[in-house]
Curated annotation (Swiss-Prot):
It comes from Methanococcus vannielii. Residues 149-152 are annotated as: G4. This is Elongation factor 1-alpha. It catalyses: GTP + H2O = GDP + phosphate + H(+). It is found in: Cytoplasm. Residues 189-191 are annotated as: G5. It comes from the Archaea. Residues 91-94 are annotated as: G3.
Length: 428
């Protein structure tokens, strides 16, 4: 079998009107991942609906409802090859009510491309753009590039490009902790393909890489095989003749037959008999592998979705309480001590109570603005002490970042996102 190229997960982020889906569609077409005939058909469909220019976006906006609204809702995954990688695109939704998807999407990303409209230099940075960049930073994405889109609308003006580059650098990236000097800003016209996959003939002043070349310059993630084993359970099946088969994705560490393991917070202990992926038995599985495995000594009723598997020598941490850094994204009123929304962390969904709001922070710099504030509102960042209403596994981001991040949901929306910075473990 030929060695496949390494996979790189790249999130495309930015405001809903910046042309993200069109940029992605163009990458897929010029990268040979979609049939040009499909674009011809979608162009016709777009024109009939009075949405000319949406044909590339339709590739990612696979859901019918999305096509009609012209809005990306779910996290869509598509692949295309570059010289170096097999790139999986995570096209993150742009609208506020879909931030939950954004969080689950971004946490799978190794790098991100922020798509901005060159016209933003006139209108200012959209709040949504800020939120997206802040979120990927909070979720641990450290590699970023910026696509300055719709350059054809300003006749590929170098002055307009430089104005936007300075604004994004000074007013957004520096404040959030990215160094603009180390970030590629690529002038593109995605609808026409300029500098997306192929170099543009229309802006001779730009000598830098295309979006595809920038993606090739990203570093592949190092698999966290040296961290303790953590595998959040997604589902548990009973297979005749085999027994109990939990399934999930290895987040950290390595799992292999013969391992003595424990599921927390269930407390069930067993031994791994077999590990399978795509119906093939594996000698071991590592981070990123979606596997099913058979455990001796553990029944279907003993464990459930949201439990986390680890080795008995280094079990997952069950928190009695934890301290977290959070950012409030949206809330109709204010958050105070005693507030108990649902926390989504790995595969678990557990209500946690705000025991104490300890500090309010500047969301851009992290400096303390106020000690022991009475409340938090949308846009605030804070350090808070939280108490789970029932046992849950969460790890400190300093130790196992993959299990330290969470989204907070309430009233059908994502009200906040954050990470655990200190965890008080339940005594075994």
């Amino acid at each position: 079998m030929a060695k496949t190229k390494p996979i790189l997960n790249v999130a495309f982020i930015g405001h809903v009107d910046a042309g993200k889906s069109t940029t992605v569609g163009r990458l897929l077409l010029d990268g040979g991942a979609i049939d040009p005939q499909l674009i011809v058909r979608l162009r016709k469909e777009a024109e009939e609906k009075g949405k000319a220019g949406f044909e590339f976006a339709y590739v990612m906006d696979g859901l019918k409802e999305e096509r009609e609204r012209g809005v990306t809702i779910d996290v869509a995954h598509k692949k295309f090859p570059t010289a170096k990688y097999e790139v999986t695109i995570v096209d993150c939704p742009g609208h506020r009510d879909f931030i939950k998807n954004m969080i689950t999407g971004a946490s799978q990303a190794d790098a991100a491309v922020l798509v901005v409209n060159v016209d933003d230099a006139k209108s200012g940075i959209q709040p949504q753009t800020r939120e997206h960049v802040f979120l990927i930073r909070t979720l641990g994405v450290r590699q970023l590039a910026v696509a300055v889109n719709k350059m054809d609308t300003v006749n590929f003006s170098e002055a307009d490009y430089n104005e936007l580059k300075k604004m994004i650098g000074d007013q957004l990236l520096k404040m959030i902790g990215f160094n603009p000097e180390q970030i590629n800003f690529v002038p593109v016209a995605s609808l026409h393909g300029d500098n997306v996959f192929k170099k543009s003939e229309r802006n001779p002043w730009y000598k830098g890489p295309t979006i595809a070349e920038v993606i090739d310059g990203f570093q592949p993630p190092e698999k966290p095989t040296n961290l303790p084993l953590r595998l959040p359970i997604q589902d548990v099946y009973t297979i005749t003749g085999v027994g109990t088969v939990p399934v999930g994705r290895v987040e950290t560490g390595i799992i292999k037959p013969g391992d003595k393991v424990v599921f927390e917070p269930a407390g069930a202990i067993g031994e791994i008999k077999t590990v399978e992926m795509h119906h093939e038995q594996l000698p071991s599985a590592e981070p990123g592998d979606n596997i099913g495995f058979n455990v001796r000594g553990v029944g279907k009723k003993d464990i459930k979705r949201g439990d986390v598997l680890g080795h008995t020598t280094n079990p997952p941490t069950v928190a009695t309480d934890f301290t977290a850094q959070i950012v409030v994204l949206q809330h109709p009123s204010v958050l105070t001590d005693g507030y108990t929304p649902v926390f989504h962390t790995h595969t678990a969904q557990i209500a946690c109570t705000f025991a104490e709001i300890q500090k309010k922070l500047n969301p851009a710099t992290g400096e303390v603005l106020e000690e022991n504030p009475d409340f938090l509102k949308a846009g605030d960042a804070a350090i808070v002490k939280l108490i789970p209403t029932k046992p849950m596994v969460i790890e400190s981001v300093k130790e196992i970042p993959q299990l330290g991040r969470f989204a907070i949901r309430d009233m059908g929306m994502t009200v906040a996102a954050g990470m655990a910075i200190q965890v008080t473990a339940k005594n075994k």
